[in-house]
Amino acid sequence: MINASLTELRAALDARKISSVELATLFLDRIERLDASLNAFITVDRDGALEAARAADARIAAGDAGPLTGIPLAHKDVFCTEGVLTTCGSKMLANFVSPYDAHVVSLLKTAGAVSLGKTNMDEFAMGSSNENSHFGPAKNPWDTTRIPGGSSGGSAAAVAARLVPIATGTDTGGSVRQPAALTGVTGIKPTYGVVSRYGMIAYASSLDQGGAFGASAADCAQLLTAMAGFDPRDSTSLERPAEDYSRELAAPAAARPLAGLRIGLPKEFFGAGMADDVRAAVEAALDGYRALGATTVDVSLPNAQLAIPAYYVIAPAEASSNLSRFDGVRYGHRAAEYRDLAEMYSKSRAEGFGAEVKRRILVGTYVLSHGYYDAYYLQAQKLRRLIAQDFQAALAGCDVIAGPTSPTTAWTIGEKSDDPVQMYLSDIYTIAVNLAGLPGLSHPCGFGAGELPVGLQLVGDYFSEARLLNAAHRFQQASDWHLRRPAIAA
Protein backbone atom coordinates (compact mmCIF):
# COMPACT_ATOMS: atom_id res chain seq x y z
CA MET A 1 0.00 0.00 0.00
CA ILE A 2 2.87 2.40 0.70
CA ASN A 3 3.92 2.61 -2.95
CA ALA A 4 0.45 2.23 -4.46
CA SER A 5 -0.88 4.81 -6.91
CA LEU A 6 -4.05 6.74 -6.13
CA THR A 7 -5.95 4.52 -8.57
CA GLU A 8 -4.71 1.42 -6.74
CA LEU A 9 -5.55 2.91 -3.34
CA ARG A 10 -9.03 3.82 -4.56
CA ALA A 11 -9.61 0.26 -5.78
CA ALA A 12 -8.37 -1.22 -2.49
CA LEU A 13 -10.61 1.07 -0.43
CA ASP A 14 -13.66 0.40 -2.58
CA ALA A 15 -13.06 -3.37 -2.46
CA ARG A 16 -12.74 -3.17 1.37
CA LYS A 17 -9.24 -4.65 1.20
CA ILE A 18 -8.23 -1.87 3.57
CA SER A 19 -10.20 0.74 5.45
CA SER A 20 -9.50 4.47 5.46
CA VAL A 21 -8.63 4.25 9.15
CA GLU A 22 -6.14 1.44 8.49
CA LEU A 23 -4.62 3.34 5.58
CA ALA A 24 -4.29 6.56 7.57
CA THR A 25 -2.76 4.65 10.47
CA LEU A 26 -0.27 2.99 8.12
CA PHE A 27 1.04 6.36 6.92
CA LEU A 28 0.84 8.01 10.36
CA ASP A 29 3.00 5.23 11.77
CA ARG A 30 5.52 5.78 8.96
CA ILE A 31 5.64 9.48 9.78
CA GLU A 32 6.23 8.67 13.45
CA ARG A 33 9.01 6.25 12.54
CA LEU A 34 10.80 8.15 9.76
CA ASP A 35 10.17 11.86 10.07
CA ALA A 36 12.72 12.40 12.83
CA SER A 37 15.39 11.99 10.14
CA LEU A 38 13.55 14.05 7.50
CA ASN A 39 11.78 16.87 9.37
CA ALA A 40 9.22 16.94 6.56
CA PHE A 41 6.33 17.75 8.92
CA ILE A 42 5.81 20.71 11.23
CA THR A 43 2.52 19.37 12.62
CA VAL A 44 1.09 15.85 12.57
CA ASP A 45 -2.65 15.76 13.30
CA ARG A 46 -3.21 12.10 14.23
CA ASP A 47 -6.53 12.65 16.00
CA GLY A 48 -7.95 14.82 13.22
CA ALA A 49 -6.73 12.39 10.58
CA LEU A 50 -8.36 9.37 12.21
CA GLU A 51 -11.61 11.28 12.66
CA ALA A 52 -11.58 12.20 8.96
CA ALA A 53 -10.73 8.60 8.05
CA ARG A 54 -13.72 7.29 10.01
CA ALA A 55 -15.95 9.74 8.15
CA ALA A 56 -14.43 8.55 4.86
CA ASP A 57 -15.16 4.93 5.74
CA ALA A 58 -18.79 5.88 6.39
CA ARG A 59 -18.98 7.54 2.96
CA ILE A 60 -17.48 4.50 1.29
CA ALA A 61 -19.96 2.21 3.06
CA ALA A 62 -22.81 4.45 1.89
CA GLY A 63 -21.59 4.33 -1.72
CA ASP A 64 -20.77 8.05 -1.65
CA ALA A 65 -17.02 7.88 -2.26
CA GLY A 66 -15.24 10.14 -4.73
CA PRO A 67 -11.77 9.65 -6.22
CA LEU A 68 -9.98 11.03 -3.12
CA THR A 69 -12.31 9.79 -0.37
CA GLY A 70 -10.16 8.12 2.27
CA ILE A 71 -6.86 9.03 0.57
CA PRO A 72 -4.20 10.39 2.98
CA LEU A 73 -2.46 13.65 2.09
CA ALA A 74 -0.52 16.50 3.67
CA HIS A 75 -0.82 20.26 3.29
CA LYS A 76 2.04 22.69 2.96
CA ASP A 77 1.94 24.79 6.12
CA VAL A 78 1.06 27.89 4.11
CA PHE A 79 -2.59 26.79 3.84
CA CYS A 80 -4.87 27.79 6.71
CA THR A 81 -6.43 24.77 8.43
CA GLU A 82 -9.22 25.31 10.94
CA GLY A 83 -8.23 24.26 14.44
CA VAL A 84 -4.73 23.18 13.38
CA LEU A 85 -1.45 25.09 13.67
CA THR A 86 -0.66 27.14 10.55
CA THR A 87 2.89 28.45 10.96
CA CYS A 88 4.11 29.31 7.45
CA GLY A 89 7.48 28.05 8.69
CA SER A 90 7.93 31.19 10.80
CA LYS A 91 8.45 32.12 14.43
CA MET A 92 5.95 34.91 13.71
CA LEU A 93 3.15 32.32 13.41
CA ALA A 94 4.64 29.51 15.50
CA ASN A 95 1.55 29.38 17.74
CA PHE A 96 -1.12 30.51 15.27
CA VAL A 97 -4.17 28.24 15.03
CA SER A 98 -6.28 29.23 12.04
CA PRO A 99 -9.99 29.87 12.67
CA TYR A 100 -10.92 28.84 9.12
CA ASP A 101 -9.90 26.60 6.21
CA ALA A 102 -8.24 27.76 3.03
CA HIS A 103 -10.37 27.16 -0.07
CA VAL A 104 -8.04 24.35 -1.18
CA VAL A 105 -8.27 22.68 2.23
CA SER A 106 -12.06 22.99 2.20
CA LEU A 107 -12.31 21.44 -1.29
CA LEU A 108 -10.15 18.49 -0.29
CA LYS A 109 -12.12 17.96 2.92
CA THR A 110 -15.31 17.92 0.87
CA ALA A 111 -13.69 15.38 -1.46
CA GLY A 112 -13.11 13.14 1.57
CA ALA A 113 -9.31 13.29 1.58
CA VAL A 114 -7.66 12.65 4.94
CA SER A 115 -5.13 15.29 6.00
CA LEU A 116 -2.35 13.83 8.14
CA GLY A 117 -0.71 17.16 8.94
CA LYS A 118 1.21 20.22 7.78
CA THR A 119 4.55 20.08 6.00
CA ASN A 120 7.75 22.04 6.49
CA MET A 121 8.59 25.00 4.27
CA ASP A 122 10.85 28.00 3.89
CA GLU A 123 9.56 30.84 6.05
CA PHE A 124 6.68 32.61 4.29
CA ALA A 125 7.63 30.57 1.18
CA MET A 126 10.83 32.60 0.75
CA GLY A 127 13.59 30.20 -0.18
CA SER A 128 14.79 27.47 -2.52
CA SER A 129 16.13 24.93 -0.04
CA ASN A 130 13.82 24.71 3.00
CA GLU A 131 16.74 25.95 5.13
CA ASN A 132 14.86 29.14 6.01
CA SER A 133 12.29 27.34 8.15
CA HIS A 134 12.03 28.38 11.80
CA PHE A 135 11.52 24.68 12.55
CA GLY A 136 14.80 23.55 10.98
CA PRO A 137 15.50 22.34 7.44
CA ALA A 138 13.64 19.46 5.87
CA LYS A 139 16.00 16.77 4.54
CA ASN A 140 16.15 15.11 1.14
CA PRO A 141 15.11 11.43 1.44
CA TRP A 142 17.73 10.43 -1.16
CA ASP A 143 20.53 11.85 0.99
CA THR A 144 19.65 13.42 4.32
CA THR A 145 22.75 15.63 4.25
CA ARG A 146 21.15 17.45 1.30
CA ILE A 147 18.28 19.87 0.86
CA PRO A 148 14.92 18.81 -0.65
CA GLY A 149 14.45 22.13 -2.46
CA GLY A 150 12.04 24.86 -1.55
CA SER A 151 9.96 26.44 -0.57
CA SER A 152 7.63 23.39 -0.57
CA GLY A 153 10.45 21.07 0.50
CA GLY A 154 8.49 19.32 3.24
CA SER A 155 5.69 18.28 0.89
CA ALA A 156 8.17 17.01 -1.71
CA ALA A 157 10.19 15.08 0.87
CA ALA A 158 7.04 13.57 2.38
CA VAL A 159 5.85 12.26 -0.99
CA ALA A 160 9.32 11.02 -1.98
CA ALA A 161 9.68 9.09 1.29
CA ARG A 162 6.09 7.82 0.98
CA LEU A 163 5.02 9.44 4.24
CA VAL A 164 1.97 10.46 2.21
CA PRO A 165 0.85 9.52 -1.31
CA ILE A 166 0.11 13.14 -2.32
CA ALA A 167 0.60 16.64 -0.92
CA THR A 168 -0.29 20.23 -1.66
CA GLY A 169 2.27 22.94 -2.28
CA THR A 170 2.56 26.47 -3.57
CA ASP A 171 4.71 27.83 -6.37
CA THR A 172 5.76 31.50 -6.55
CA GLY A 173 9.00 31.11 -8.49
CA GLY A 174 9.43 27.34 -8.72
CA SER A 175 8.49 26.18 -5.22
CA VAL A 176 6.59 23.09 -6.40
CA ARG A 177 8.61 22.19 -9.49
CA GLN A 178 12.14 22.61 -8.10
CA PRO A 179 11.66 20.47 -4.96
CA ALA A 180 9.80 17.90 -7.07
CA ALA A 181 12.87 17.66 -9.30
CA LEU A 182 15.34 17.44 -6.42
CA THR A 183 13.41 14.70 -4.59
CA GLY A 184 12.38 12.60 -7.60
CA VAL A 185 8.61 13.18 -7.56
CA THR A 186 6.14 14.84 -9.91
CA GLY A 187 4.86 18.34 -9.24
CA ILE A 188 2.61 20.71 -11.14
CA LYS A 189 1.93 24.44 -10.91
CA PRO A 190 -1.25 25.30 -12.85
CA THR A 191 -2.05 28.49 -14.71
CA TYR A 192 -2.21 31.49 -12.37
CA GLY A 193 -5.78 31.80 -11.09
CA VAL A 194 -6.80 28.15 -11.52
CA VAL A 195 -6.35 27.36 -7.81
CA SER A 196 -7.80 29.79 -5.26
CA ARG A 197 -5.40 31.71 -3.03
CA TYR A 198 -8.03 32.26 -0.33
CA GLY A 199 -6.55 31.13 2.97
CA MET A 200 -3.11 30.64 1.42
CA ILE A 201 -0.81 32.97 3.35
CA ALA A 202 0.42 35.50 0.81
CA TYR A 203 4.01 36.04 -0.26
CA ALA A 204 3.79 37.66 -3.72
CA SER A 205 0.13 37.86 -4.69
CA SER A 206 0.58 38.17 -8.46
CA LEU A 207 2.85 35.11 -8.54
CA ASP A 208 1.64 32.72 -5.80
CA GLN A 209 -0.25 29.67 -7.04
CA GLY A 210 -1.28 26.43 -5.36
CA GLY A 211 0.06 23.20 -6.82
CA ALA A 212 0.18 19.44 -6.38
CA PHE A 213 2.78 16.76 -5.60
CA GLY A 214 2.49 13.06 -6.35
CA ALA A 215 4.65 10.14 -7.37
CA SER A 216 3.26 10.33 -10.90
CA ALA A 217 1.51 12.64 -13.33
CA ALA A 218 -1.63 10.53 -12.91
CA ASP A 219 -1.65 11.13 -9.14
CA CYS A 220 -1.04 14.86 -9.63
CA ALA A 221 -3.91 15.02 -12.12
CA GLN A 222 -6.36 13.62 -9.58
CA LEU A 223 -5.19 15.98 -6.83
CA LEU A 224 -5.22 19.06 -9.08
CA THR A 225 -8.74 18.22 -10.29
CA ALA A 226 -9.93 18.40 -6.68
CA MET A 227 -7.97 21.59 -5.88
CA ALA A 228 -8.97 23.68 -8.88
CA GLY A 229 -12.10 25.77 -9.21
CA PHE A 230 -13.50 29.28 -9.07
CA ASP A 231 -13.65 31.01 -5.70
CA PRO A 232 -15.33 34.44 -5.46
CA ARG A 233 -13.32 35.17 -2.30
CA ASP A 234 -10.14 35.38 -4.40
CA SER A 235 -10.23 38.31 -6.83
CA THR A 236 -7.66 36.60 -9.07
CA SER A 237 -9.56 33.28 -9.23
CA LEU A 238 -10.62 32.47 -12.78
CA GLU A 239 -14.23 31.53 -13.48
CA ARG A 240 -13.93 28.53 -15.78
CA PRO A 241 -15.84 25.26 -16.23
CA ALA A 242 -14.70 22.44 -13.97
CA GLU A 243 -12.02 20.33 -15.61
CA ASP A 244 -10.97 16.71 -15.13
CA TYR A 245 -7.21 16.76 -15.61
CA SER A 246 -7.17 12.95 -15.80
CA ARG A 247 -9.44 12.85 -18.83
CA GLU A 248 -6.71 12.16 -21.40
CA LEU A 249 -4.79 9.64 -19.32
CA ALA A 250 -7.05 6.64 -19.85
CA ALA A 251 -6.59 6.50 -23.64
CA PRO A 252 -5.40 3.08 -24.84
CA ALA A 253 -1.64 2.65 -25.03
CA ALA A 254 -0.19 3.18 -28.49
CA ALA A 255 3.22 2.56 -30.00
CA ARG A 256 3.74 6.29 -30.50
CA PRO A 257 1.28 7.94 -28.09
CA LEU A 258 2.83 11.40 -28.46
CA ALA A 259 2.86 11.49 -32.26
CA GLY A 260 2.22 15.05 -33.37
CA LEU A 261 3.39 16.66 -30.12
CA ARG A 262 5.90 19.43 -30.82
CA ILE A 263 8.33 20.09 -27.97
CA GLY A 264 10.15 23.41 -28.01
CA LEU A 265 13.69 23.52 -26.64
CA PRO A 266 14.73 27.05 -25.61
CA LYS A 267 18.39 27.62 -26.37
CA GLU A 268 18.56 29.78 -23.25
CA PHE A 269 17.77 26.73 -21.08
CA PHE A 270 20.55 24.59 -22.54
CA GLY A 271 23.53 26.93 -22.30
CA ALA A 272 26.19 27.39 -19.66
CA GLY A 273 25.16 26.90 -16.06
CA MET A 274 23.55 23.46 -16.35
CA ALA A 275 25.52 20.71 -14.62
CA ASP A 276 26.80 17.96 -16.90
CA ASP A 277 24.92 15.20 -15.07
CA VAL A 278 21.67 17.16 -15.32
CA ARG A 279 22.26 17.78 -19.03
CA ALA A 280 22.84 14.08 -19.69
CA ALA A 281 19.63 13.05 -17.91
CA VAL A 282 17.55 15.75 -19.61
CA GLU A 283 18.86 14.91 -23.09
CA ALA A 284 18.18 11.20 -22.50
CA ALA A 285 14.62 12.06 -21.45
CA LEU A 286 14.11 14.13 -24.59
CA ASP A 287 15.25 11.10 -26.61
CA GLY A 288 12.56 9.17 -24.75
CA TYR A 289 9.93 11.69 -25.82
CA ARG A 290 11.11 11.43 -29.42
CA ALA A 291 10.80 7.64 -29.22
CA LEU A 292 7.16 8.13 -28.18
CA GLY A 293 6.48 10.12 -31.35
CA ALA A 294 7.14 13.70 -30.25
CA THR A 295 9.26 16.02 -32.35
CA THR A 296 11.58 18.69 -30.98
CA VAL A 297 12.07 22.17 -32.38
CA ASP A 298 14.40 24.96 -31.34
CA VAL A 299 12.77 28.03 -29.80
CA SER A 300 14.05 31.13 -28.06
CA LEU A 301 13.13 33.00 -24.89
CA PRO A 302 15.45 36.00 -25.34
CA ASN A 303 14.48 37.73 -22.10
CA ALA A 304 14.56 34.63 -19.90
CA GLN A 305 17.94 35.61 -18.44
CA LEU A 306 16.24 38.71 -17.00
CA ALA A 307 13.63 36.70 -15.10
CA ILE A 308 15.60 36.48 -11.84
CA PRO A 309 16.30 40.23 -11.51
CA ALA A 310 12.69 41.03 -12.47
CA TYR A 311 11.37 38.50 -9.96
CA TYR A 312 13.56 39.77 -7.14
CA VAL A 313 12.09 43.23 -7.59
CA ILE A 314 8.43 42.27 -8.03
CA ALA A 315 8.18 39.50 -5.42
CA PRO A 316 9.86 41.43 -2.56
CA ALA A 317 7.79 44.50 -3.41
CA GLU A 318 4.58 42.51 -3.01
CA ALA A 319 5.95 40.74 0.07
CA SER A 320 6.77 44.01 1.82
CA SER A 321 3.11 44.95 1.49
CA ASN A 322 1.66 41.53 2.33
CA LEU A 323 3.80 41.02 5.42
CA SER A 324 3.01 44.44 6.86
CA ARG A 325 -0.04 42.81 8.49
CA PHE A 326 2.17 40.86 10.90
CA ASP A 327 2.57 43.43 13.65
CA GLY A 328 1.98 41.48 16.85
CA VAL A 329 -1.41 43.06 17.51
CA ARG A 330 -4.14 40.76 16.25
CA TYR A 331 -2.23 37.50 15.91
CA GLY A 332 1.30 36.19 15.63
CA HIS A 333 4.40 36.75 17.72
CA ARG A 334 4.42 39.72 20.09
CA ALA A 335 7.55 40.95 21.85
CA ALA A 336 7.50 40.37 25.60
CA GLU A 337 8.81 43.81 26.54
CA TYR A 338 8.24 47.18 24.87
CA ARG A 339 7.79 50.79 25.92
CA ASP A 340 5.19 51.90 23.38
CA LEU A 341 3.23 50.79 20.33
CA ALA A 342 5.97 51.67 17.84
CA GLU A 343 8.52 49.62 19.77
CA MET A 344 6.07 46.72 20.02
CA TYR A 345 5.73 46.73 16.22
CA SER A 346 9.46 46.92 15.58
CA LYS A 347 10.52 44.39 18.21
CA SER A 348 7.77 41.91 17.33
CA ARG A 349 8.76 41.99 13.65
CA ALA A 350 12.48 41.90 14.39
CA GLU A 351 12.02 38.85 16.62
CA GLY A 352 9.35 37.14 14.53
CA PHE A 353 10.88 37.27 11.04
CA GLY A 354 13.98 35.37 9.92
CA ALA A 355 16.93 36.80 8.00
CA GLU A 356 15.74 36.00 4.46
CA VAL A 357 12.27 37.40 5.11
CA LYS A 358 13.79 40.60 6.51
CA ARG A 359 16.08 40.85 3.47
CA ARG A 360 13.18 40.64 1.05
CA ILE A 361 11.01 43.08 3.03
CA LEU A 362 13.87 45.59 2.95
CA VAL A 363 14.42 45.12 -0.78
CA GLY A 364 10.70 45.41 -1.46
CA THR A 365 10.33 48.55 0.62
CA TYR A 366 13.31 50.10 -1.16
CA VAL A 367 12.10 49.43 -4.72
CA LEU A 368 8.66 50.86 -3.87
CA SER A 369 10.05 53.96 -2.20
CA HIS A 370 9.84 57.47 -3.64
CA GLY A 371 12.42 57.97 -6.34
CA TYR A 372 13.03 54.28 -6.97
CA TYR A 373 9.59 53.01 -8.00
CA ASP A 374 10.05 54.02 -11.65
CA ALA A 375 13.66 52.87 -11.78
CA TYR A 376 13.04 49.41 -10.37
CA TYR A 377 9.44 48.29 -9.98
CA LEU A 378 8.07 49.68 -13.24
CA GLN A 379 11.07 48.39 -15.18
CA ALA A 380 10.61 44.93 -13.67
CA GLN A 381 6.94 44.95 -14.71
CA LYS A 382 7.97 45.84 -18.27
CA LEU A 383 10.40 42.92 -18.27
CA ARG A 384 7.60 40.69 -17.03
CA ARG A 385 5.47 41.61 -20.05
CA LEU A 386 8.39 40.94 -22.41
CA ILE A 387 8.97 37.51 -20.85
CA ALA A 388 5.27 36.63 -21.24
CA GLN A 389 5.41 37.76 -24.88
CA ASP A 390 8.50 35.59 -25.46
CA PHE A 391 6.64 32.53 -24.23
CA GLN A 392 3.68 33.26 -26.50
CA ALA A 393 5.99 33.65 -29.50
CA ALA A 394 7.74 30.37 -28.66
CA LEU A 395 4.48 28.48 -28.08
CA ALA A 396 3.20 29.61 -31.47
CA GLY A 397 5.66 27.12 -32.96
CA CYS A 398 5.30 24.26 -30.47
CA ASP A 399 2.85 22.61 -28.10
CA VAL A 400 4.98 22.44 -24.96
CA ILE A 401 8.37 23.78 -23.92
CA ALA A 402 10.84 21.45 -22.21
CA GLY A 403 14.10 21.82 -20.34
CA PRO A 404 15.75 21.14 -17.01
CA THR A 405 13.81 22.05 -13.88
CA SER A 406 16.93 22.82 -11.84
CA PRO A 407 20.48 23.50 -13.08
CA THR A 408 21.93 21.06 -10.51
CA THR A 409 20.90 18.16 -8.34
CA ALA A 410 20.30 18.72 -4.61
CA TRP A 411 23.17 20.43 -2.80
CA THR A 412 24.34 19.85 0.74
CA ILE A 413 22.67 21.66 3.64
CA GLY A 414 24.52 24.91 4.29
CA GLU A 415 26.36 24.92 0.95
CA LYS A 416 24.62 28.05 -0.39
CA SER A 417 23.23 29.55 2.80
CA ASP A 418 25.72 32.43 2.86
CA ASP A 419 25.37 33.29 -0.83
CA PRO A 420 21.85 34.53 -1.67
CA VAL A 421 22.68 35.02 -5.36
CA GLN A 422 23.74 31.39 -5.83
CA MET A 423 20.59 30.32 -3.99
CA TYR A 424 18.43 32.50 -6.25
CA LEU A 425 20.09 31.04 -9.38
CA SER A 426 18.77 27.59 -8.47
CA ASP A 427 15.38 28.78 -9.78
CA ILE A 428 16.74 30.12 -13.06
CA TYR A 429 14.58 27.79 -15.20
CA THR A 430 11.37 28.09 -13.21
CA ILE A 431 10.90 31.76 -12.33
CA ALA A 432 10.05 32.94 -15.86
CA VAL A 433 7.06 30.58 -15.91
CA ASN A 434 5.57 32.31 -12.86
CA LEU A 435 6.20 35.77 -14.30
CA ALA A 436 4.22 34.71 -17.38
CA GLY A 437 1.50 32.97 -15.32
CA LEU A 438 1.84 29.75 -17.33
CA PRO A 439 1.39 26.16 -16.14
CA GLY A 440 4.54 24.15 -15.49
CA LEU A 441 5.23 20.56 -14.49
CA SER A 442 8.34 18.71 -13.34
CA HIS A 443 8.71 14.95 -13.53
CA PRO A 444 11.62 12.63 -12.70
CA CYS A 445 13.81 11.88 -15.72
CA GLY A 446 16.93 10.23 -14.35
CA PHE A 447 19.71 10.51 -11.82
CA GLY A 448 22.88 12.53 -11.60
CA ALA A 449 26.06 12.05 -9.64
CA GLY A 450 25.57 10.40 -6.27
CA GLU A 451 22.28 8.87 -7.42
CA LEU A 452 20.44 12.15 -6.91
CA PRO A 453 17.23 12.76 -8.87
CA VAL A 454 16.98 15.01 -11.94
CA GLY A 455 13.71 16.56 -13.13
CA LEU A 456 12.48 17.58 -16.58
CA GLN A 457 10.25 20.65 -16.76
CA LEU A 458 7.35 20.93 -19.20
CA VAL A 459 5.71 24.32 -19.77
CA GLY A 460 2.52 24.90 -21.73
CA ASP A 461 0.20 27.66 -22.82
CA TYR A 462 -2.47 28.97 -20.48
CA PHE A 463 -4.89 26.25 -19.29
CA SER A 464 -2.92 23.42 -20.95
CA GLU A 465 -2.46 21.47 -17.71
CA ALA A 466 -4.15 18.38 -19.17
CA ARG A 467 -1.72 18.37 -22.10
CA LEU A 468 1.30 18.63 -19.80
CA LEU A 469 -0.02 15.86 -17.56
CA ASN A 470 -0.77 13.63 -20.54
CA ALA A 471 2.72 14.10 -21.99
CA ALA A 472 4.34 13.32 -18.63
CA HIS A 473 2.01 10.34 -18.14
CA ARG A 474 2.95 8.82 -21.51
CA PHE A 475 6.63 9.26 -20.66
CA GLN A 476 6.06 7.59 -17.29
CA GLN A 477 4.22 4.68 -18.91
CA ALA A 478 7.38 4.03 -20.93
CA SER A 479 9.90 4.58 -18.11
CA ASP A 480 10.32 3.86 -14.43
CA TRP A 481 12.09 6.93 -13.05
CA HIS A 482 8.95 7.91 -11.15
CA LEU A 483 8.81 4.46 -9.55
CA ARG A 484 12.31 4.67 -8.05
CA ARG A 485 12.26 5.14 -4.29
CA PRO A 486 14.95 6.26 -1.85
CA ALA A 487 16.15 3.60 0.58
CA ILE A 488 14.34 5.32 3.45
CA ALA A 489 11.02 4.68 1.68
CA ALA A 490 11.49 0.91 1.62
From Swiss-Prot:
<dbReference type="InterPro" id="IPR020556">
    <property type="entry name" value="Amidase_CS"/>
</dbReference>
<dbReference type="InterPro" id="IPR036928">
    <property type="entry name" value="AS_sf"/>
</dbReference>
<dbReference type="InterPro" id="IPR023631">
    <property type="entry name" value="Amidase_dom"/>
</dbReference>
<protein>
    <recommendedName>
        <fullName>Glutamyl-tRNA(Gln) amidotransferase subunit A</fullName>
        <ecNumber>6.3.5.7</ecNumber>
    </recommendedName>
</protein>
<comment type="function">
    <text>Allows the formation of correctly charged Gln-tRNA(Gln) through the transamidation of misacylated Glu-tRNA(Gln) in organisms which lack glutaminyl-tRNA synthetase. The reaction takes place in the presence of glutamine and ATP through an activated gamma-phospho-Glu-tRNA(Gln).</text>
</comment>
<dbReference type="GO" id="GO:0050567">
    <property type="term" value="F:glutaminyl-tRNA synthase (glutamine-hydrolyzing) activity"/>
</dbReference>
<dbReference type="GO" id="GO:0005524">
    <property type="term" value="F:ATP binding"/>
</dbReference>
<keyword id="KW-0436">Ligase</keyword>
<dbReference type="InterPro" id="IPR000120">
    <property type="entry name" value="Amidase"/>
</dbReference>
<dbReference type="GO" id="GO:0030956">
    <property type="term" value="C:glutamyl-tRNA(Gln) amidotransferase complex"/>
</dbReference>
<keyword id="KW-0648">Protein biosynthesis</keyword>
<keyword id="KW-0067">ATP-binding</keyword>
<dbReference type="Pfam" id="PF01425">
    <property type="entry name" value="Amidase"/>
</dbReference>
<feature type="active site" description="Charge relay system">
    <location>
        <position position="76"/>
    </location>
</feature>
<dbReference type="GO" id="GO:0006412">
    <property type="term" value="P:translation"/>
</dbReference>
<feature type="active site" description="Charge relay system">
    <location>
        <position position="151"/>
    </location>
</feature>
<feature type="active site" description="Acyl-ester intermediate">
    <location>
        <position position="175"/>
    </location>
</feature>
<comment type="subunit">
    <text>Heterotrimer of A, B and C subunits.</text>
</comment>
<dbReference type="InterPro" id="IPR004412">
    <property type="entry name" value="GatA"/>
</dbReference>
<comment type="similarity">
    <text>Belongs to the amidase family. GatA subfamily.</text>
</comment>
<keyword id="KW-0547">Nucleotide-binding</keyword>
